[in-house]
Amino acid sequence: MSPQTETKASVGFKAGVKEYKLTYYTPEYQTKDTDILAAFRVTPQPGVPPEEAGAAVAAESSTGTWTTVWTDGLTSLDRYKGRCYRIERVVGEKDQYIAYVAYPLDLFEEGSVTNMFTSIVGNVFGFKALRALRLEDLRIPPAYVKTFQGPPHGIQVERDKLNKYGRPLLGCTIKPKLGLSAKNYGRAVYECLRGGLDFTKDDENVNSQPFMRWRDRFLFCAEALFKAQVETGEIKGHYLNATAGTCEEMIKRAVFARELGVPIVMHDYLTGGFTANTSLAHYCRDNGLLLHIHRAMHAVIDRQKNHGIHFRVLAKALRMSGGDHIHSGTVVGKLEGERDITLGFVDLLRDDFVEQDRSRGIYFTQDWVSLPGVLPVASGGIHVWHMPALTEIFGDDSVLQFGGGTLGHPWGNAPGAVANRVALEACVKARNEGRDLAQEGNQIIREASKWSPELAAACEVWKEIVFNFAAVDVLDK
């Protein structure tokens, strides 16, 4: 331990303010397997050295405060403090640096994403010495991962429950998202499921409003999916949004869903909060319910490149807190999502072990030590012409969710579902035959449309719909 960075009670207390880097910048530190490691994108205020800025982040997100306090001498500061152990300049960006910070595991409560974030991304983001701050990535050590239940069931158990293998799952968000009565809402659910979809979904802001109370919606949706199951011989589901104003009300809605016998419920995990989400995930595992997660509010937190929290961190946090699905962007649709970045955090959601790969934005190797995986959900502005790209990008372990791309079909909801199912089956068959979906995708869809009038009509409606906008959040050069 360097004398410069070691804190000793024996040297006595000296009041005043000292530079953070004297205590919290420790480039000689060797990280431990049990440390939580963080990569912050730091933009210091003019005149603030990067070492001081990085040390300030480490201090303010762990044991430090703005002045020396005499109670520092009552504990082992070196055991508990965060340490900025490396700083890199960001190539191509003015006054931006990646500051790497190591946190001792004892700083965090076991099994609590809430506590972890309260420390790491708490007051430090309002610190005046920083112009901007973004948490790019976290390395969660196996010792901490093991304190979490994680997803209620995971990918393999979900496939076994649904008895569906060898292809992506198909979904649809019911539209319009607000204003339908419960009976009309249930009718739309039935038509989509009968047409060939695996799931339908409540939109994120469908909770319990005057036009459709939650209990009525749950009843009509359950009736719809059971009727569709009988007619198709397939297991169906509807994501019943249990998000509510209190945890108690949320659990009450999940209990009612279980009593109805439906397979899956839903939660808005960012607006609902990590404590509520973890509570619901535990209930779902104990009671055999799958849990679909919507990421409403994420872009407020993750879209700007120099400030906030990258979605790969929010995705890791969700895997720890618990969820069987989570929306991940589409790459090709209407929502933000650069391909390499998206595939990076998709792997972090699904795989058991992910190597560091800066070309995909992954700053640390992550070992999930058999924590169940999460299915990424591609949703937002997608239609049948996107099916080859979606199948190629996301692979089998995913949910492809078409809202307007189902309900906007000129012949109605059921034909819209048929069009999507035929397009998906054609893409999976072509891929399994060795065809290149990226190069032959349009041809594959045209060939399939010759045998499906529903798909042909969908192809005509959406043949010119594209979303050509540059991504805001891109990889560093």
Swiss-Prot record:
Membrane-spanning residues: none
Location(s), subcellular: Plastid, Chloroplast
Listed Pfam families: RuBisCO_large, RuBisCO_large_N
Query: Where is it chiefly localized?
Result: plastid
Which cofactor does this sequence's record say it needs? Answer: Mg(2+)
PROSITE patterns, per database record: RUBISCO_LARGE
The active site consists of 175 (proton acceptor), 294 (proton acceptor)
**One GO biological process term:** reductive pentose-phosphate cycle
Residue positions where N6,N6,N6-trimethyllysine is found in the record: 14
Catalytic activity line of the entry: 2 (2R)-3-phosphoglycerate + 2 H(+) = D-ribulose 1,5-bisphosphate + CO2 + H2O; D-ribulose 1,5-bisphosphate + O2 = 2-phosphoglycolate + (2R)-3-phosphoglycerate + 2 H(+)
Site label Transition state stabilizer, positions: 334
Positions bound to substrate: 123, 173, 177, 295, 327, 379
Q: What is its EC number?
A: 4.1.1.39
User: According to the lineage, what is the superkingdom?
Assistant: Eukaryota
Q: What class of enzyme is it?
A: lyase
User: Per its record, what are the GO molecular function terms?
Assistant: magnesium ion binding; monooxygenase activity; ribulose-bisphosphate carboxylase activity
Cofactor binding comment, as recorded: Binds 1 Mg(2+) ion per subunit.
Q: How is it modified after translation?
A: The disulfide bond which can form in the large chain dimeric partners within the hexadecamer appears to be associated with oxidative stress and protein turnover.
Q: Where on the chain is N-acetylproline found, per UniProt?
A: 3
- Describe the protein's quaternary organization and the partners it interacts with: Heterohexadecamer of 8 large chains and 8 small chains; disulfide-linked. The disulfide link is formed within the large subunit homodimers.
**Its biological purpose:** RuBisCO catalyzes two reactions: the carboxylation of D-ribulose 1,5-bisphosphate, the primary event in carbon dioxide fixation, as well as the oxidative fragmentation of the pentose substrate in the photorespiration process. Both reactions occur simultaneously and in competition at the same active site.
Protein family: Belongs to the RuBisCO large chain family. Type I subfamily.
State the remark under miscellaneous.
Answer: The basic functional RuBisCO is composed of a large chain homodimer in a 'head-to-tail' conformation. In form I RuBisCO this homodimer is arranged in a barrel-like tetramer with the small subunits forming a tetrameric 'cap' on each end of the 'barrel'.
Which NCBIfam families would you find in this protein's record? PRK04208.1
Q: What is this protein called?
A: Ribulose bisphosphate carboxylase large chain
Naturally occurring in which organism (per UniProt): Nicotiana debneyi (Debney's tobacco)
